């Protein structure tokens, strides 16, 4: 049997250097930008690069890779880059931003008190979803404070949804006051009763 | 009570209390209700089971309601033809327009009364009120 010469190993694709990653992130093809987004976190200037890339990116899967990279960085600063996208008119962008913030609870928590007081009710509502990933005591305290001052029934409902899971006997008073404030909202009455039953049964 | 016992409704909403509220309203009128926690789970369900109506929230983790709608409408019939009632707290014109462009049959702004929900479910299921 003749000896078969083993083919030479193909040359390894050289890893892109830092400058290449930065260029790829902004100017590359969809696949290159996606790859670069995943590698950018290794660079010292990752945050400004990802911030710029996110503001320009129009392809959903690349945008998601950028959100994931920012979540992976897990800093208060990287959370701050994501937060404005909670206000997007595009539901997919809001979802991607929310998912990213929920993946970095420690960093998101720094911004949460401000988000729960945001002038935009839709932002306050999404902030309730971020609170869900905090330790139960922290989430309950923040959401009880929110419910005490909140005038929008949908935001109250979002907070009650989380409190039904995290709340304690201390939450019952706030829930009772909320029911009194919105007597004309049947969904809130239903949500409050269900939450109180669940908390009471624990 | 009208008989909607053969009408199957899929409720897609990440809020457990909302799903329970809708279920209570619809089951009281005889609808059969299935639930999904987000658009992705909703898609899995519509691919496996037949539904007369989907009631879909907009803001949900993993897959939002608008993306769900775009994907649903890109499927083959009869899946692509399932009537979809979008429910959301997003009351801006932009969101309503996005839902309409994505193929929503109607858009209801939360909070929604149980009677209203059941009434629209009956209309879209082709059942007499």
Q: Which residues make up each language-model segment?
A:
Chain A
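Short amphipathic alpha-helical segments that mediate assembly, nucleic-acid/protein binding
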Residues: 18-21
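Generic anion/oxyanion-binding catalytic loop in active/binding sites
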Residues: 25, 86, 181
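N-terminal, post-signal-peptide region of Sec/Tat-exported proteins
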Residues: 45-47
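Structural detector for internal amphipathic alpha-helices that build alpha-solenoid repeat scaffolds
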Residues: 2-13, 23, 30-43, 52-53, ...
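Alpha-helical scaffold repeats of the Armadillo/HEAT/TPR superfamily
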Residues: 142, 174-181
């Amino acid at each position: 049997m003749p000896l078969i010469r083993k083919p030479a190993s193909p040359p390894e694709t050289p890893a892109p250097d830092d400058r290449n990653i930065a260029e790829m992130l902004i100017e590359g093809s969809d696949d290159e930008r996606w790859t670069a987004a995943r590698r950018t976190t290794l660079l010292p200037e990752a945050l400004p690069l990802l911030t710029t890339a996110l503001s320009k990116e129009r392809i959903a899967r690349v945008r998601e890779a950028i959100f994931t990279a920012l979540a992976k960085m897990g800093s208060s600063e990287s959370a701050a880059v994501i937060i404005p996208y909670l206000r997007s008119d595009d539901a997919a962008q809001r979802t991607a931003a929310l998912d990213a913030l929920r993946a970095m609870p420690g960093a998101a928590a720094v911004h949460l008190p401000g988000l729960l007081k945001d002038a935009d009710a839709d932002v306050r509502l999404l902030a309730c979803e971020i609170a869900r990933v905090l330790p139960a005591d922290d989430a309950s305290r923040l959401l009880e404070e929110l419910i005490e001052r909140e005038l929008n029934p949908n935001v109250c409902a979002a907070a009650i949804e989380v409190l039904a899971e995290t709340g304690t006997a201390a939450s019952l008073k706030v829930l009772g006051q909320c029911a009194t404030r919105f007597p004309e909202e049947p969904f809130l009455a239903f949500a409050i009763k269900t939450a109180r039953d669940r908390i009471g049964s624990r | 009570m009208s008989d909607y016992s053969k009408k199957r409704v899929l409720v897609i909403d990440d809020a457990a209390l909302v799903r329970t509220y809708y279920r209570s309203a619809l089951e009281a009128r005889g609808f059969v209700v299935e639930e999904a926690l987000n658009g992705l789970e909703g898609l899995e369900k519509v691919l496996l089971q037949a539904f007369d109506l989907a009631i879909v929230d907009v803001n949900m983790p993993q897959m939002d309601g608008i993306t769900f709608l775009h994907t649903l409408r890109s499927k083959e019939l009869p899946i692509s033809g399932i009537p979809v009632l979008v429910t959301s707290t997003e009351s801006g014109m932009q969101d309503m327009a996005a839902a309409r462009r994505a193929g929503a049959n109607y858009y209801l702004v939360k909070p929604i009364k149980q009677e209203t929900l059941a009434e629209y479910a009956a209309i879209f299921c082709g059942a007499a009120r």
